[in-house]
Regions:
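Glycine-anchored, exposed beta-strand/edge motif detector
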Residues: 3-143
Length: 143
């Protein structure tokens, strides 16, 4: 960003938070107070869970510091993805109805109200089988 005086600033792409629970690397998280917790797009949960801020850069135990990738490349594993063993390059991924997980819109269950989803929240674009460019979008409430 460049202001009127020609001074350039770059927003942070990673921030450090306190883990509100035990977290694994590549987990999709939202902020609650001063803690980050696993986000979920499930129906019947507090809509705050539908608003992820990023993906954890490393594993952390509850109350420990954890870096969260807000807008950069995150490494995710098969344990972070629903119905897939790896990311599909070029595929967009969304917040799953399972806390902290990602799903492709083409997953077998899809993202529908019949799949117990309350919202569809874009999280990022797969660059490789394990790299996701984090691009958090606004949740779309499903009715």
């Amino acid at each position: 960003l460049v202001n009127g005086a020609g001074v350039t600033t770059s927003p942070a792409t990673t921030l450090t938070f306190s883990a509100g629970d035990n977290l694994v690397q590549g987990e999709v998280v939202y902020v609650s107070g001063t803690y980050v917790l696993p986000a979920s797009a499930a129906s019947g949960v507090d809509p705050a869970l539908w608003n992820p801020i990023g993906i954890t850069a490393e594993a952390a135990v509850a109350a420990a510091d954890v870096d969260v990738i807000l807008d950069d490349i995150a490494i995710v594993s098969s344990g972070n993805i629903v119905h897939q063993t790896a990311l599909t390059p070029g595929q967009y991924y969304y917040l799953a109805n399972i806390p902290g997980k990602l799903t492709a819109s083409t997953a077998p269950s899809g993202i529908t109200t019949s799949g117990l989803y309350g919202a569809m929240t874009p999280v990022g674009l797969a660059l490789s089988a394990s790299e996701l460019h984090v691009e958090i979008g606004s949740p779309v409430t499903l009715t």
